[in-house]
Regions:
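Conserved Class I S-adenosyl-L-methionine
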Residues: 182-247
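A short SAM/SAH-binding and catalytic strip from SAM-dependent methyltransferases
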Residues: 101-115
Length: 247
């Protein structure tokens, strides 16, 4: 191995356990969607599982990361789903690829709009009446201190996320009813963040003199310091949202 690996330990690109993923797939396929749209899909693991559970459905994944999309295409081929899914390397802003019966937007609302209310309005536009939206969105368990914010991501601010009650309220204001509200556990966060860095940490231990080692080490150390700071402070909500139909 001569270059740092990327995300090979991750099944999902977020704090999502296998049991929760199974529950989400079961809930999101209850209304038998025939079209699925995945915003900021990455390698689209959750969408592929939904397609496998709903043989009549087709899916579209949108992302700007070519490497992640290639991983998604390989996974689709391995599962015999190639003819039912397409992966598009493009921006999701103003996307014409809707409406869909099921819209997934997990950790990717910023791909639709800069502010959460506008992103929620876009999700309402992109989902069919009687469809579902799965929104995976960050929230604060408590307001972080200035010292904590300084150790998180660059220019982190207490206004970067709402609290959970405010988040759900924004979804209601955008024309949804919350069918189900759940949040990632601390175990899910620790599994995700550890898997996110695991291969890189092993590579750094085995290649300390590599030309890329210094910058890779600095990046890994910065990310670890950030997540150990927002651990227990930053949450991720999984909201299953039902659009309110026009009267």
């Amino acid at each position: 191995m001569t270059t740092p690996p990327r995300h090979s330990r991750l099944t999902f690109h977020g704090p999502l356990s296998e049991p929760r993923a199974d529950r989400l797939v079961a809930r999101l396929t209850r209304h038998a969607p025939t079209t699925v749209l995945d915003i900021g899909c990455g390698w689209a693991e959750l969408m592929l599982r939904i397609l496998a559970a709903t043989p009549a459905a087709t899916g579209t994944g949108i992302d700007i990361n070519a490497e992640d999309l290639a991983r998604g295409r390989q996974a689709a081929e391995a599962r015999g789903l190639t003819d039912r899914v397409r992966f598009l390397e493009e921006s999701a802003t103003g996307t014409p690829h809707g409406p869909a019966d099921l819209v997934l937007c997990v950790g990717a609302s910023q791909a639709l709009a800069g502010q959460l209310p506008e992103a929620l309005a876009e999700l309402r536009r992109l989902v069919t009446d009687h469809g579902r939206v799965l929104l995976g969105e960050g929230f604060w368990h408590r307001t972080p201190t200035e010292a904590e914010l300084a150790r998180m991501w660059p220019d982190a601010s207490a206004t970067d996320h709402p609290d959970l009650a405010t988040l759900v309220g924004l979804a209601v204001d955008a024309g949804f009813r919350p069918e189900w509200t759940e949040t990632a556990s601390l175990d899910e966060w620790e599994a995700f963040e550890s898997a996110y860095l695991a291969d890189t940490e092993v590579w750094l231990a085995e290649h300390p003199g590599h030309p890329l080692a210094a910058e890779t080490r600095e990046r890994a150390d910065r990310h670890r310091a950030a997540w150990l700071t927002y651990r227990g402070v930053l949450g991720l909500a999984y909201l299953t949202l039902v659009p309110v139909v026009a009267r």
